[in-house]
């Protein structure tokens, strides 16, 4: 009769709260559907086209980050409804997400249109630092180049 054998595998399934904010980003963009106003946590196994459907700019940004992030990549995603839903602006979306997640940086997937948008990102960063004592950087997206108007 043979003796039994026990094998123990210590797997990191990335479950539970994110304890280290390094390299964990929040992607914010406008979209539609039932995911608006909900914080999504995505990783390399997530179905991004299903989770972020209807937010093409955001989907492109998150997909590029995932493809460049390596096997243990993860991020948070927040959609807002620019046409007047419960979370109606990127600023509101960031406020909602900060209540639920700790991140190193915030990536705005929709193009910025003016200098006041950049100033608003700086002001939001300072408010987050004042309220949560979390240093957070922001990355905005420049508008697409238009040869006719340039």
Residue ranges of predicted features:
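Surface-exposed assembly/interface segments
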Residues: 1-150
């Amino acid at each position: 009769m043979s003796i039994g054998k026990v094998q123990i595998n210590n797997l990191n399934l990335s479950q539970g709260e994110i304890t280290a904010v390094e390299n964990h980003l929040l992607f914010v963009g406008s979209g539609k559907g039932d995911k608006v106003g909900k914080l999504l946590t995505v990783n390399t196994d997530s179905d991004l086209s299903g989770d972020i459907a209807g937010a093409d700019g955001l989907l492109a940004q998150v997909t590029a980050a995932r493809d460049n992030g390596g096997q243990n990549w993860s991020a948070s995603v927040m959609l807002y409804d620019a046409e007047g839903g419960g979370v109606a602006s990127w600023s509101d979306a960031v406020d909602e997400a900060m209540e639920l997640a700790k991140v190193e940086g915030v990536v705005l997937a929709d193009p910025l249109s003016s200098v006041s948008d950049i100033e608003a990102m700086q002001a939001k960063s300072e408010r987050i630092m004042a309220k949560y004592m979390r240093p957070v950087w922001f990355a905005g997206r420049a508008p697409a180049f238009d040869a006719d108007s340039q």
